[in-house]
Amino acid sequence: MATYDHAATPIPQSPGVGGVPFSSCIGDLLRFVLSSHAAAYPGDDTVAFPLSPSYCARLLNDGELFEKLEACIQQCLEEGRLPGPPAVVGIPAEEEGPEERGWKLLLPEKGAELKRMYDAVEFELHVQEPYFTQLRAGVKKVEGRLATGNYNRITQGSLLLFNKCLLLNVEAVRKYNSFSEMLQGEKISNVLPGISSIVEGVKVYRKFYTEEKENSYGVLAISVSMPTSQPYITMNNILAGLGYDGLGRLLGMAKTTGTVPDGLPPPRSALLSSCMGLVQPNVGLTLMTLPIHLSILFLNLRELPPFETSLAPKTGTVLFNWR
């Protein structure tokens, strides 16, 4: 099962202050949504989401595909439009249909939606697992932090962004002399779900803060609630609205008769390995359209004459040299 690895994302100096450019969050947002559906995250409506878990996992785990999809989604949201279909020799270009018109409406709307959310952010924080999942699920209602620097600027009504994916409203901020005192004053299950004793709770915070700093600055209990609008919900709607055909368009795949809806190309390494291998005779008609501008047509010949293959350095096109 695919999982969202927060450790793979550089941890920003916490808390960051001010609005966040949404373009800097697309990768984390896309990775989070794909990993949630690939792993069937509890609470997600997998019935309403049109992409299969295996499809999401393949996008997530193929570095080249993921990077291409991230860059294309970012560009589309900034420009408010989808690129045209890739040109395929011998296949006439299709006229714009209702699906394409729907994409044209979806992208500028959702791009503006994301921008509004990220512009409204006042403080950006990062949390490790399992605390991020607990905050998203609403079981962790209080975030404990050292009362230093910009943390002291957080007040009731502030909008916080966690891990570039989750927005939380600040309901209240209370200051304590120590984490032990905070865990006594707050309901421990709201601060550290799954931890039953104050002693164990203090041990959790000791992994992040020394006792000396705790005594010097004191600590803050930041009570939070989850607003309805969330960046990950918007990204979820973008992927659902594009579906297999729209995402295929972003990845440079041409839609032809007989195209498998959830088909994705193999990794470049697997493709080159196959092309460089021995070609068996009596091969039927197969058309494979791939990203990275690779299109291979195997002709319906019962006996292929001997040939060699090579890779064009600039275009990445596979060349067939007949002997």
Residue ranges and their predicted role:
Residues M1-L167, E171-W322:
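Mixed-charge, low-complexity intrinsically disordered regions
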